[in-house]
């Protein structure tokens, strides 16, 4: 893996067409987000070199070390079994330096040349499946610009605390550090992280940095440095004094009179009957029809309190953002988001820029499942 580097496709020989494994992944619909596809193809290649006729269990074992969130491994396993059969039927074997003729390339015809009903009732190949099967650059982190700084975030060890004092002088003096930012260095602009349509669903309860932390892992300071190692070292040099505040972990306790307020900032903007005085994020009631009459006529009435825990979508690609100024003095935000236009609209007031001076580019994302509808690191 160290020899292959960031792009796993470098582990096989480049050809004009596609080898049988790539072809099987493309034609079987095995490629979803594509973030894990090159690694799966390399694992399949290693398996089929040793065992040209594997069982399904052997294929699953070969792919088991590769994390995949999208496919549940169903289609990739089918693709490897199909590739194995195709190779056996062709009389070929996999070798270290195999090349395959153009004939292995699946038929792809430009859409504008097709009759109107040509595709009805037929399976179509994913438009960027070939690119992903070849492991070509497709994701945010695949673009590496010269002179790029690495940003790291100092996070809170406390669930609820005030920042009484923060000293970043040692971090700023570290060679290779370009910038250190704390809440004292940034405009205090309230916003929502929810990437939804205007008007922005609230509550507006976030700041780029604040002098109060509200959960373990909340943002305390930013560092930009020449390398990730320097940035991490700089974070360790930031001296923070916290005043711990009462921690509330049960929503019932949070809504009791006299409970510590999580959001006591005056800039807080209400949404959906939220009530920061009792730590209520939202209150939503939906009535359909005559509710009172329905209860009065019901034979049975069931009342229950339902608790819905937060679920992590577990996409394989993390949140990644690359920003730079282009030749027209526009801020370009290249980011792994599902909502580029919402990012653009919400970033403008936070950065104090006209929206026309912000351009958001959304490359292929390595899974999101709704989690990348939130503006978190941009």
Summary of predicted features, one role per range:
Residues 1-106:
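Signature of N-terminal electron-transfer/Fe-S-associated modules in redox systems
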Residues 261-351:
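Helix-loop-helix junctions that connect adjacent transmembrane helices in secondary transporters/permeases
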């Amino acid at each position: 893996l160290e020899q292959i580097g960031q792009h796993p496709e470098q582990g096989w020989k480049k050809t004009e067409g596609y080898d049988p494994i790539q072809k099987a992944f493309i034609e079987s619909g095995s490629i979803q987000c594509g973030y894990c596809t090159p690694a799966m193809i390399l694992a399949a290649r290693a398996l089929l070199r040793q065992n040209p006729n594997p069982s399904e269990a052997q294929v699953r074992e070969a792919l088991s070390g590769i994390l995949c969130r999208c496919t549940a491994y169903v289609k990739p396993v089918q693709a490897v079994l199909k590739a194995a059969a195709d190779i056996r039927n062709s009389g070929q074997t996999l070798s270290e330096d195999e090349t395959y003729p153009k004939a292995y390339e699946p038929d792809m015809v430009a859409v504008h040349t097709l009759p109107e009903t040509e595709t009805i009732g037929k399976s179509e190949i994913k438009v960027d499946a070939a690119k992903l099967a070849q492991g070509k650059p497709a994701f945010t982190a695949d673009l590496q610009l010269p002179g790029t700084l690495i940003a790291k975030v100092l996070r809170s060890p406390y669930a609820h605390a005030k920042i009484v004092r923060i000293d970043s002088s040692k971090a700023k003096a570290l060679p290779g550090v370009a910038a250190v930012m704390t809440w004292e260095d940034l405009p205090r602009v309230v916003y929502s992280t929810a990437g939804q349509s205007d008007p922005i669903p609230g509550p507006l309860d976030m700041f780029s940095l604040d002098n109060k932390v509200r959960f373990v892992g909340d943002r305390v300071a930013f560092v930009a440095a020449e390398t990730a190692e320097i940035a991490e070292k700089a974070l360790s040099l930031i001296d923070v004094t916290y005043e711990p505040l009462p921690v509330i972990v049960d929503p019932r306790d949070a809504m009791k009179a006299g409970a510590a307020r999580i959001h006591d900032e005056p800039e807080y903007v209400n949404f959906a009957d939220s009530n920061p005085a009792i730590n209520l994020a939202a209150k939503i009631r939906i009535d359909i029809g005559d509710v009172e009459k329905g209860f009065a006529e019901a034979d049975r009435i069931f009342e229950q309190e339902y608790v819905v825990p937060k679920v992590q979508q577990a996409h394989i690609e993390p949140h990644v953002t690359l920003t730079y100024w282009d030749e027209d003095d526009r801020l370009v935000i290249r980011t792994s988001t599902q909502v580029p236009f919402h990012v653009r609209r919400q970033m403008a007031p936070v950065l104090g820029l006209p929206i026309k001076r912000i351009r958001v580019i959304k490359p292929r994302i390595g899974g999101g499942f709704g989690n990348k509808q939130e503006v978190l690191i941009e």
